[in-house]
Amino acid sequence: MAILRADELRGMSMEELKEKLVELKRELLKERASKAVAGAPSNPGRMREIRRTIARILTIMNEKKRMTSQ
């Protein structure tokens, strides 16, 4: 899965963001499992990018929640 930028994420609906969040969390879990088994991941920067994208999604979801509550 390609890493999504903030402007791409802001164009998505809340449901799409939730789906991407679940998908990325699964991918991160797989990466962590492969790291635990194999020792060194095949792409060490991938875990960092997944974590950062998850943080972006959560930030944008919170922004959208705040905008609807105002």
From Swiss-Prot:
One of its GO terms (biological process) is translation. Transmembrane segments: none annotated. The keyword Ribosomal protein applies. Keywords: Ribonucleoprotein, Ribosomal protein. SUPFAM superfamilies: Ribosomal protein L29 (L29p). The keyword Membrane does not apply. GO terms for molecular function: structural constituent of ribosome. GO terms for cellular component: cytosolic large ribosomal subunit. Belongs to the universal ribosomal protein uL29 family. This is Large ribosomal subunit protein uL29.
